[in-house]
């Protein structure tokens, strides 16, 4: 149809038209000018710019005016335009020119109403599809030439199928729109006939990347379409292209409600009707349209309605004809409600285009005739207005203009004599849509968010808020903290959007987050606490049972927040191993660590749940036990139940129990394979011992400490094992030690047990992993350096039978009690300390390294080790303990050191260790301000000078 003769242009539009026409006259001075030219050029800067650059397009419009059905020629026209294209750059230029040319014709026809709004939407959609298909075909041939043709196992060539989503899929694309695509191929396989072979996934990924570049990358000619691939399975974090099988698995196992909404409009680009296309449609259909009337979707729709309402209020979207109340999105939403609920039973509701589907909704009596009429009329009104708005400058916007020129353009283009008249009619249409929307969806169902104190936090979680929206909820926070908090919420919400969460998980998360935010935002350090919680939450968003645990148990949620607020180390542990959340259910056990002597029995009972012959489950169970016990120790630490020395005691008892369990497991595996060494037939025990050095030996274990271990065996040289695969007895113990190391270091889903360092064994890394008791004794007497005797001060046996323990303790005592030249000993200990200090030098003089700097913990350790080696020959009882605190007590008790000095060193040691311990809980380094521990450092240096400098 035509509205010619056209009404007179307002003055402002006449002036705009004359400016545009003057440019065209320069480019095509002989071309006649009509009233239609003046009208279109007044409405669209995009059209006037395009025709000024390509005056032949203007001439073409005069010679062959745009027609409603000319989309049927797009494929042929584009094919002709690509005849001389020989490379990707030329392809990109040709596609951009073609899109711009066709858009100019569509805008011309649209402005003059020589085609209906439905025709314009069809033309815009067909244009995009033709370009996408042509680009795919051109690039497919090029890629096949480079890498061969992708084939399945039977050698059948595999195509790239492209799903157009959203308005493109529905044939309702707007004038300036991005395009939502999903790439998929039928079967896995490899390329054939190319210079190099690729698997199909690689081939189609590369093809997809090149296709996106051809369409999306800005050049001097602009771009063709902004390509959005986020609707694909797993979003941005997923593969760019999936096989049919992978896509089917995803939608069956993890498809979410919003993906059902999106898939309603999915359409294969190119109108393909081959076997592969039919297979893909059949695969997707059960996910989108359920065979039964699917009322389970209603709550999701209500939740979405509430989100829309909050977004309208928050963003003041009254001037947005798509997102505002009663806008285009609500009409689309209303239509899809019926498609998702009843589409499985009603084939007429399975269409992709909105208006035909809306008519079928009316025919089924699901909406009244008046409602269908109101929605259809409003939809066409809004879509025409949207296209005219975007055609002004080829910009993707749905917000009505505030400047007079563009307001007059829209008013005249819509057939109104003024902006106010247009706005009045627009308001009527949007109110009619909103009325149907409210009637259809109803009120949000009551849920957790209806609790008064949580409703605001529901809005905070569900919406993309401005920073200012957070202030009323958190008046006690500073602006800086609010900004950090807001940033964390937004980043978390974006990260969640990339995860594949089922409908139930999404619902639970949406109920949990307001509760969690209400608790967290009440804290002064809300930003810090939330930043510690979000990694954990991201780790469990796809594991609904954990979300439900926190939602249903407010006590567990409270304990989680408390622990994460107190310690980022605990937060990190929970994030890595969510199984630990079960420990939060009972506060009475959470804050009461296992009794020191009960760890071995607790672990034994824990392992009884696991088949003894299942090595993998045994490994996993020991790790889970360690983590749960460490969490309880940390909770007791944070809760003030355990002082720092007791924390180390508990961590040490735990490690000893685990060492025994690991040796037991390794022993069982070795005996099953080789039998046991024959010399054990008439004696108790296993002839194997584990010696702990360092922090474990000294009862000073921390949360992340590694274990310094040395393995000893007690086995005659002529012993063999008694199994069918008999091996040398000492070879058996070597393999046993190797198996122990393997069990400690194997990484399972629950991580490793401990880092184990066995380099303190005789001859270090060059020595045998396990030594005989006799070889250990000989090495310590004849080859060991003074620093190795220092290390022996902190050594003790943590696994083995009493006979081996007595032998080891006898060797240790004998070595430590040996007569030594005082000056030589002092020099060697002092020089070793200097080497360490140089190796671990702290170059930042404004900081004090609590452990390694002068006056720190290492100096105290060297003092105690020196004193044992210096005076144990006179007083053997100085060798009784392996930890620094009790060694200092022995020094005072037996008169080696004044009691006041021993107490001062002990206090300095405990104070600095306590600080190191709490820094570890905060995941901070051991370097503090140089102004810290001044008195303690002075005392340590006085003692250092006294004992090791001879001052």
Curated annotation (Swiss-Prot):
What this protein catalyses is: [glutamine synthetase]-O(4)-(5'-adenylyl)-L-tyrosine + phosphate = [glutamine synthetase]-L-tyrosine + ADP; [glutamine synthetase]-L-tyrosine + ATP = [glutamine synthetase]-O(4)-(5'-adenylyl)-L-tyrosine + diphosphate
- CDD domains, per the entry: NT_GlnE_GlnD_like
* Membrane-crossing segments per the record: none
* Residues spanning the signal sequence: none
Q: Which UniProt keywords apply?
A: ATP-binding, Magnesium, Multifunctional enzyme, Nucleotide-binding, Nucleotidyltransferase, Transferase
Q: Does the keyword Nucleotidyltransferase apply?
A: yes
Tell me, in a sentence or two, what this protein's role is: Involved in the regulation of glutamine synthetase GlnA, a key enzyme in the process to assimilate ammonia. When cellular nitrogen levels are high, the C-terminal adenylyl transferase (AT) inactivates GlnA by covalent transfer of an adenylyl group from ATP to specific tyrosine residue of GlnA, thus reducing its activity. Conversely, when nitrogen levels are low, the N-terminal adenylyl removase (AR) activates GlnA by removing the adenylyl group by phosphorolysis, increasing its activity.
Q: What is this protein called?
A: Bifunctional glutamine synthetase adenylyltransferase/adenylyl-removing enzyme
Q: Which organism is it from?
A: Pectobacterium atrosepticum (strain SCRI 1043 / ATCC BAA-672)
State the taxonomy lineage.
Bacteria, Pseudomonadati, Pseudomonadota, Gammaproteobacteria, Enterobacterales
């Amino acid at each position: 149809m035509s509205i010619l003769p056209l009404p007179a242009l307002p003055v402002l539009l006449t002036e705009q038209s004359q400016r545009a026409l003057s440019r065209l006259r320069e480019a095509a001075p002989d071309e006649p000018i009509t009233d239609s030219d003046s009208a279109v050029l007044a409405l669209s800067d995009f059209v006037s710019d395009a025709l000024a650059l390509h005056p032949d397009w203007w001439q073409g419009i005069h010679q062959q005016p745009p027609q409603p059905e000319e989309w049927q020629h797009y494929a042929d026209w584009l094919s002709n335009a690509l005849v001389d294209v020989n490379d990707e750059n030329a392809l990109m230029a040709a596609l951009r020119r073609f899109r711009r040319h066709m858009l100019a014709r569509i805008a011309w026809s649209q402005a003059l109403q020589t085609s209906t709004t439905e025709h314009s939407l069809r033309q815009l959609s067909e244009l995009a599809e033709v370009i996408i298909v042509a680009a795919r075909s051109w690039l497919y041939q090029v890629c096949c030439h480079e890498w061969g043709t992708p084939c399945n196992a039977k050698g059948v060539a595999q195509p790239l199928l492209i799903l157009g989503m959203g308005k493109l899929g529905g044939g309702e694309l707007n004038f300036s729109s991005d395009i939502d695509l999903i790439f998929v191929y039928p079967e896995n396989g490899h390329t054939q006939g190319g210079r190099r072979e690729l698997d199909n996934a690689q081939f189609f990924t590369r093809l997809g990347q090149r296709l996106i570049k051809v369409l999306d990358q800005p050049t001097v000619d602009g771009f063709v379409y902004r390509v959005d691939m986020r609707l694909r399975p797993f979003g941005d974090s997923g593969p760019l292209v999936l096989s049919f099988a992978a896509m089917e698995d995803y939608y069956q196992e993890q498809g979410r409600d919003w993906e059902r909404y999106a898939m309603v409009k999915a359409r294969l680009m190119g109108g393909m009707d081959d076997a592969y296309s039919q297979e893909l449609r059949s695969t997707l259909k059960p996910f989108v349209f359920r065979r039964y009337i699917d009322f389970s979707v209603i709550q999701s729709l209500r939740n979405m309605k509430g989100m829309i309402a909050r977004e309208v209020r928050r963003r003041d979207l009254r001037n947005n004809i798509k997102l505002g109340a009663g806008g285009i999105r609500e009409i689309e939403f209303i239509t899809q409600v019926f498609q998702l609920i009843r589409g499985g039973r009603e084939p007429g509701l399975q269409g992709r285009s909105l208006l035909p589907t809306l008519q079928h909704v009316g025919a089924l009596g699901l909406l009244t005739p008046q409602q269908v009429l109101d929605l259809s009329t409003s939809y066409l009104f809004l879509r025409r207005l949207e296209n005219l708005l975007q055609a002004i400058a080829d910009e993707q916007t749905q917000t009505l203009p505030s400047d007079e020129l563009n307001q007059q353009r829209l008013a005249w283009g819509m057939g109104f004599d003024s902006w106010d008249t247009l706005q009045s009619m627009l308001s009527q249409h949007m109110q009619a849509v909103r009325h149907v929307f409210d009637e259809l969806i109803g009120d949000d169902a009551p849920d957790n968010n209806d609790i008064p104190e949580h409703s605001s936090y529901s809005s905070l979680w569900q919406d993309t808020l401005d920073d200012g929206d957070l202030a009323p909820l958190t008046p006690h926070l500073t602006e800086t903290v609010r900004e950090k908090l807001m940033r964390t919420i937004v980043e978390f919400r974006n990260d969640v959007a990339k995860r594949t969460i089922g409908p139930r998980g999404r619902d639970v998360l949406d109920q949990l987050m307001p509760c969690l935010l209400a608790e967290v935002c009440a804290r002064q350090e809300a930003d810090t606490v939330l930043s510690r919680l979000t990694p954990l939450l991201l780790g469990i968003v796809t594991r609904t049972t954990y979300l439900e645990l926190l939602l249903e148990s407010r006590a567990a949620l409270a304990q989680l927040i408390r622990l994460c607020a107190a310690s980022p180390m605990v937060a990190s542990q929970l994030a890595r191993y969510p199984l630990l959340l079960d420990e939060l259910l009972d506060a009475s056990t959470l804050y009461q660590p296992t009794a020191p002597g009960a760890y071995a029995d607790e672990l034994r009972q824990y392992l009884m749940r696991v088949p003894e012959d299942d090595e993998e489950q045994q490994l996993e169970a020991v790790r889970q036990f360690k983590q749960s016990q460490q969490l309880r120790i940390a909770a007791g630490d944070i809760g003030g139940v355990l002082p720092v020395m007791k924390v180390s005691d508990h961590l040490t008892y735990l490690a000893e129990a685990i060492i025994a369990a690991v040796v037991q497991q390794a022993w069982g595996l070795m005996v099953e394979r080789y039998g046991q060494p024959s010399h054990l037939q008439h004696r108790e025990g296993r002839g194997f011992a584990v010696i702990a050095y360092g922090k474990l030996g000294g009862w000073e274990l921390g949360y992340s400490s590694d274990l310094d271990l040395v393995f000893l065996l007690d086995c005659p040289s002529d012993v063999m094992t008694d199994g069918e695969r008999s091996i040398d007895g000492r070879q058996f113990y070597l393999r046993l030690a190797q198996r122990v190391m393997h069990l400690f270091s194997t990484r399972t889903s629950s991580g490793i047990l401990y880092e184990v360092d066995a380099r303190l064994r005789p001859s270090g890394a060059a020595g045998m992993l396990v030594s005989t008791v006799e070889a250990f004794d000989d090495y310590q007497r004849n080859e060991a350096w003074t620093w190795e005797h220092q290390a022996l001060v902190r050594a003790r046996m943590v696994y083995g039978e009493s006979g081996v323990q007595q032998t080891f303790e006898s060797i240790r005592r004998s070595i430590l009690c040996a007569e030594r030249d005082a000056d030589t000993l002092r020099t060697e200990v002092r020089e070793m300390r200097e080497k360490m200090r140089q190796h671990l030098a702290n170059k930042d003089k404004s900081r004090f390294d609590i452990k390694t700097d002068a006056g720190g913990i290492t100096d105290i350790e060297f003092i105690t080790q020196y004193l044992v080696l210096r005076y144990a020959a006179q007083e053997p009882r100085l060798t009784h303990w392996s930890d620094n605190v009790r060694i200092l007590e022995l020094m005072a008790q037996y008169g080696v050191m004044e009691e006041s000095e021993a107490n001062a060193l002990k206090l300095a040691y405990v104070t600095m260790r306590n600080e190191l311990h709490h820094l570890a809980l905060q995941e901070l380094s051991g370097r503090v301000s140089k102004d810290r521990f001044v008195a303690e450092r002075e005392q340590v240096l006085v003692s250092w000078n006294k004992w090791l400098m001879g001052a």
